[in-house]
């Protein structure tokens, strides 16, 4: 989610987020980009955002999810956001599985990059060879860790 938040902020969209614990390197990544990350609280949504993205680890009982439902705020899942904001019209390479997704997705993005295809990518970690976990370009290619 942090990489997507950074990409949306680069597009000029106001972003904030919540989690029960964010640690380096992701906390550093967010801080460097000026993205606030707070503990879960319904008060985080008092300003009635245009869209609430609810992660797959969030369930009923979460104060922000409950507030979004009670206040009838627009909400979606991360996959829905990715589809509508980034993936439509792209040639997507989605890496799935139990182990090795980050490494494999990083390798695919690097191979496409070094073959001049300038891919977009969204990877759960921050690969050393790419320097960031997400990049959004005008390329037809998009590598995503699924």
Region spans (language model):
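Phosphate-binding loop of NTP-binding sites
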Residues: 7, 31, 56, 60-146
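N-terminal leader/targeting and accessory segments in enzymes
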Residues: 1-81
